Amino acid sequence: DGLATDGYQSMGYSIRYEAGIFKQKLVDGWQTELPDFWLPGGDVWLVPREERSVEVKFEGHVEESWDGDYHSVEQKDCNTVTAVPYDMYVSGKGQGVSRLRLWASVKPSLDMSLFNQGEYMRAMEQSAMAEAISKILYPADNSPEGKSLRLRQQYFLVSASIQDIIRRHLTEYSTLDNLPEKIAIHINDTHPTMAIPELMRIMLDECGYGWDDAWNIVTKTVAYTNHTVMKEALECWSEELYKRLLPRLYEITKEIDNRFRAYVWCTTHDADKVERMAIISGGVVRMANLCVAGSHSVNGVSALHSEILKETVFSDFYSITPDKFKNVTNGIAFRRWICQSNPLLTDYITKLIGSDFITKSNELLKLREYKDDKKVLADFMAIKRQNKERFAKIVKKRNGIDINPDSIFDVQVKRLHEYKRQSLNILNIIAEYQMLKANPNADFVPRTYIFASKAAPGYFMAKKTIQLIDAISNVINNDKDVNDKLKVVFMEEYNVSLAEVLMPAADFSEQISLAGTEASGTGNMKLMLNGAVTLGTLDGANVEIANAVGDDNIIIFGLKTPEVEQLKQRGYHPMDYINNNRVLKDVIDFINAGIDGKTFGEFTSSLMNVDPYMALADFADYQKAQQLSAEIYKDKERFAKMSLMNISGAGIFSADRAITEYAENIWHTKPVAFPQEKSAPAPKKEAAAKKPAAKKAKAEKSAKAAK
């Protein structure tokens, strides 16, 4: 949408998955995964382009030969699959249209030689393996078979896409010498990393380039965006698996590694640094290192994240090639998350400042002229109330729970991961529950905690956390002593459609990851755009949200990134925080005693013994932040002003802005100039036809003209 709206020629590539990651169903609080079939249904938007199909090769062995000065390489006895493209057209706000090309994997044909030899199952297995590649998004990779399928998916995507890019370029220019001037290939995270050696393979094996010329072209063409600082997400593949599945690509990757090692040694004469920066080391292929080595640009997705990349994750690379490193803060599909999701708010903003903000998001800053207008603030709160009522009906229908639209809607919606610290939120909820049980008449602002998230199928602790949320919600929501003041809701099967109803209803946006662990986040931007006030740590894009709205319009708590590092160096001891905080100790004891007939020893044991993301260290400060949010909400005018300031400051987080920064600073491209539409001539005033026949003739004439 952003590329099309801004007028940049673009083609996105992905896989035509038959099913999404999974549909989430809680059974006795435990997440179970059901198939989420995308096809049929979604394919109504797809245009098949079988004539553009390409072949992708796996396994086999490599044979090399020389004919004079000509070097020939052939991959033999390989398993071949056909990548069939399907195009989806994405129109922007205006005349621009982007194309998303999705690849479906099919076996070229049944191996009749195997079939005729009676090896029916083996023949069918080959077809099944080919089709499995585009069967499901993110198959579980906690088994050798799962890892193999993931690697096949990644190579299938990059091989088909790079072949398509090269074909289209050669059709236009008949040479690859000008590839960097005409094409920008952007690697989004490490999943498409193999685009680098695959582009080298085509240039070396199919186009006859020498290594140095090919590498020069590749590294000027490819750019890389990193999306995480989590070590487990910086992909590493078993060298043995990589070599077995992709024999030719392994040879090229190995040569890249050898040459890059030599370059680093000549530059630094530091053997330790050579090993840290190596692409292949310790029996694994490091995809993030390959990305940085093979790209002309490396960027993070928030100002803090980009600094962390330079200071820690890729510090060795930064010390050698500092000019590679840039920042482009994430942006969101602005028009979806306000115009489509929140039509009431969109209409009211249009009434106040006009409609230019729909394509020029910084126009929202004009709303600040109304920050002291009590009538406008009251209108904003009335719209928020209507959106909360709309969401409350969804909760009643899906969960059977009545929630109070006048209570605080405290929202934490994101994937379930320990670093995102849903655990910290739960600890505070239990503390509030215990306080209300002990003091039923306490002055407590009614609050509804809303969770929505999915856990990776093989991530036990994340699933256990969901079960804990479900258990405590059952206890609280059925306790008549507190349920008029405190409610907890977990929304199953969180997706974009649910988010479009939930985000306009949120009062406070929980962005509470440990400082230094979240690359950026985009949920924080979507919630901010819809008037939610951020309650969070100085992590990811929260830093830039704070800059955009001012310290008075955001609630910040917790350790800062340098303080986290200092605490790690001194030695972090979770039990110290439990022993020195009676409220926290009571919460841990409450969980250890079991909740709703379930036990959560693994959850508390992790916190007490390790607490890898320092939830206990931030607990006391988090409680203060929650208490402050309640005080703010009680002052309706103050809360309304903070909400307006967040909406008005959200324009900087539009994807349109992010796309422009990528285009200017990384891709070095300019938008296409669309022909200006001619103004329609003023209609001539015509006398009304006296006879129906005259009307009919006129209508037929107009229809022919239109055709």
Question: Each PLM stretch: what is its role?
Answer:
Residues D1-K685:
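A conserved ligand/cofactor-binding region detector
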